[in-house]
Amino acid sequence: MPIITLPDGSQRQFDNPVSTMEVAQSIGPGLAKATIAGRVNGNRVDACDLIEEDASLEIITVKDEVDGLEIVRHSCAHLLGHALKQLYPQAKMAIGPTIDNGFYYDIDLDESLTQDDLEKIEKRMKELAKTKYEVVKKKVSWQEARDTFESRGEPYKVEILDENVSRDDRPGLYHHEEYIDMCRGPHVPNMGFCQHFTLMNVAGAYWRGNSDNKMLQRIYGTAFHDKKALKAHLTRLEEAAKRDHRKLGKQLDLFHMQQEAPGMVFWHHNGWSIFRDLEVFVRSKLDEYGYQEVKGPLIMDRVLWERSGHWDKYADAMFTTSSENREYALKPMNCPGHVQIFNQGLKSYRDLPLRMAEFGSCHRNEPSGALHGIMRVRGFTQDDAHIFCTESQIQEEVTNCIKMVYDTYQTFGFDNIVVKLSTRPEKRVGSDEIWDQSEEALKQSLESMEIPYEIQEGEGAFYGPKIEFTLYDCLDRAWQCGTVQLDFNLPGRLGATYVGENNERLVPVMIHRAILGSLERFIGILIEEYAGFFPTWLAPEQVILMNITDKQSDYVQEVVQKLQKSGIRAKADLRNEKIGFKIREHTLKRVPYMLVVGDQEMEAGEIAVRTRKGKDLGKFKVDDFIAYIQDEISIRKLNLEE
């Protein structure tokens, strides 16, 4: 006779084991109709699963924007499998999980699927979903599950059972009419909940992510609770495609990538201008917050990487080379090099905190399939810093790091930031006392600034707790960029010490700090955030001057030279083209200010100013415009008056 406790504290007693659906029915038919699954004692279960003992129960409905939506998407992956097997009986089904904003299914099929094929598959999915058929779950023995999939010619399911499922388990088989899939669940009770979906694209994917295995076809899709949400998501995707940094990188002549250097960026003049401006900006923050800038070697001996522990953990991701019977590695990170700099010369507690920063060129041998424009590369530059401090200085230093993060992000217009604090894992180094002190210091730093944060229990690194900063862009996409990570391990491994107040040798605490993360990736984020319409201080070309006739050419050149001498990136367009044509062309290039000079402007020593969005700012004296734009650049103004 289980007693079920509901979220409002009320209780219901039942004479026999009861399912989530039956509890919902006892409350009301409306709730039962909306019920997708349940959460029993915090664990998600199918609506049909029986609750045999006293338990707390949350009923997951179609309105649940987290669990409910994830379950709908997972069931849509099964629906995709159902449609595929009807249209392509020879297809071998692999896995079909959910991902951010959607789902996918990996299949083994000799025929290469096209976009037209996806439309055909989606049509069949909609026909099946329209019938709102019941999804029937059956728990079976491991052997019965294996026999089922072996008889159905599904080798990937058999392999999963052989290698990933205990012989003592009772796998869940979900029957979608004649189609059977295997899953932990939960899934929707019927296909009436899966009505608003679409298939996005198809790509290649190695089985189990291993390039030694067969290449499968991965079909991506997305699903939502209602038509409005699906349409809004597709609109965001269309906007994201317009803002794609790879497309704009080519259009604005910022960078390119090529096969001979996979994952390495060829920066063009325009893109490198942005890169350098970012460095100048970050350097100004380093000066403001009391950092010293250093530069470490790009290549270091394997011996150092073994001492630091990176060889054991990162060897597969490191590029290596050898010379004179010694093995070297390109650095994947900067921290071991910074400890070497710290170790030069005797350090006292009076020298701490010591804040060391570097624009470090790092290389990681990322899988080719993971590379994505300048967002995911093999060669990148980190705005990396390491702070060597005493235990008593942790809170103040972390607070300054947090201030620097927010100060930096706000300059770029990012004000929607989610903060997560990761605490001690089960396996860790350092005493409980130092972990207690450090976690409390991180909490106090965040709370003193009234910053809301989520705690990720046990998600810290083995060598210390950390704070992660995830910023959200104009399309509400999440980008994890900044980190503040405490480290009780590396300084000791690499022999870093300082002399304490009582002349004893002590090991400093090390704080790893990154704000932009990778400059390459952050520039990619900015390209998409601004859609190429960079604020004037970052724009590769800030001003373009255009003549109406050849008569004004000398005056235009004179004004351009004056602007350039004033530190403004200005160019002249003296082509024998109509002024409207020139304006349209430079508008597409996202040049912030377009200056037009005709006879009247030339005779008055003026320029006619308009913005790239078409706003007419009127006529300026040249010196007045220089003062106007210099002020905008100096304060790093975010938006043009347009």
From Swiss-Prot:
EC number: 6.1.1.3
Annotated segments matching region Catalytic: 244-535
Cofactor notes: Binds 1 zinc ion per subunit.
Reaction catalysed by this enzyme: tRNA(Thr) + L-threonine + ATP = L-threonyl-tRNA(Thr) + AMP + diphosphate + H(+)
Domain TGS: 1-61
Cited SMART domains: tRNA_SAD
Residues involved in Zn(2+) binding: 335, 386, 512
One Gene Ontology term from the biological process aspect of the record: threonyl-tRNA aminoacylation
Subcellular location: Cytoplasm
Cofactor: Zn(2+)
Superkingdom in the source lineage: Bacteria
Name of this chain's protein: Threonine--tRNA ligase
Organism: Vibrio campbellii (strain ATCC BAA-1116)
Gene name of this polypeptide: thrS
